[in-house]
């Protein structure tokens, strides 16, 4: 018991390294920015990073600094603070089709059968790869700004519900919900 609560850096830093190693990070976008000051322009860099554990947790972060590696580090730290959990069907795709939006950017995400792969444009592909989705079809409409596309994708994923969550919200059994889904032409009864 006392060994578990020991103070000191080695064990704690090793645990932190293990926790950090479980995440996969993708650099989505790097941008050179300028701040106009009295003596001229002061240049810096802004980075957009997406991280995930490829098991249903994903987050994105934005970081700014004078040097690229520092901006990426800040963005990665921000992404770790911004992690969200997404319920996946069979651990490989979405439960249902969904749309998301942010600003002028709209994204449409569709569940896909096994073997389809990730059919999505740049920033959305990074989100799906770090999330652990293997089969999805995605379309972006409107703004192609990477920030808007990533935020719109997260907006869509935020509204994704598993059958278990829907059944709990409606106070019905999951099997009842699944039978309605499989039936297709079966009449849906409002509750």
Curated annotation (Swiss-Prot):
PROSITE patterns: RIBOSOMAL_S5 (PS00585), S5_DSRBD (PS50881). Keywords: Ribonucleoprotein, Ribosomal protein, RNA-binding, rRNA-binding. One of its GO terms (molecular function) is structural constituent of ribosome. GO terms for cellular component: small ribosomal subunit. Residues 23-86 form the S5 DRBM domain. The keyword Ribonucleoprotein applies. Pfam families: Ribosomal_S5, Ribosomal_S5_C. Residues 1-21 are annotated as: Disordered. Gene3D superfamilies: 3.30.160.20, 3.30.230.10. GO terms for biological process: translation. Part of the 30S ribosomal subunit. Contacts proteins S4 and S8. With S4 and S12 plays an important role in translational accuracy. Located at the back of the 30S subunit body where it stabilizes the conformation of the head with respect to the body. Belongs to the universal ribosomal protein uS5 family. The N-terminal domain interacts with the head of the 30S subunit; the C-terminal domain interacts with the body and contacts protein S4. The interaction surface between S4 and S5 is involved in control of translational fidelity. This is Small ribosomal subunit protein uS5. It comes from Rhodopseudomonas palustris (strain BisB5).
């Amino acid at each position: 018991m006392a060994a578990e609560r020991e103070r000191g850096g080695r064990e704690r830093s090793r645990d932190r390294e293990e926790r950090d190693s479980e995440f996969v990070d993708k650099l989505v976008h790097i941008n050179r920015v300028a701040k106009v000051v009295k003596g001229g322009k002061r240049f810096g860099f802004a980075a957009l990073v997406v991280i995930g554990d490829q098991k249903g947790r994903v987050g994105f972060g934005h970081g700014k600094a004078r040097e690229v590696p520092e901006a990426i580090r800040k963005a990665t730290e921000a992404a770790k603070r911004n992690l969200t959990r997404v319920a996946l069907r069979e651990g490989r795709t979405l439960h249902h089709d969904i749309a998301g939006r942010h600003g002028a950017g709209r994204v449409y995400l569709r569940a896909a059968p096994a073997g389809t792969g990730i059919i999505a444009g740049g920033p959305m592909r990074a989100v799906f790869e770090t999330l652990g989705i293997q089969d999805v079809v995605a379309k972006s409409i409107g703004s192609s700004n990477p920030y808007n596309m990533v935020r719109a994708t997260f907006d869509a994923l935020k509204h994704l519900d598993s059958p278990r969550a829907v059944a709990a919200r409606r106070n019905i059994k999951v099997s009842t919900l699944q039978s309605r889904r499989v039936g297709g032409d079966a009449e849906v009864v409002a509750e």
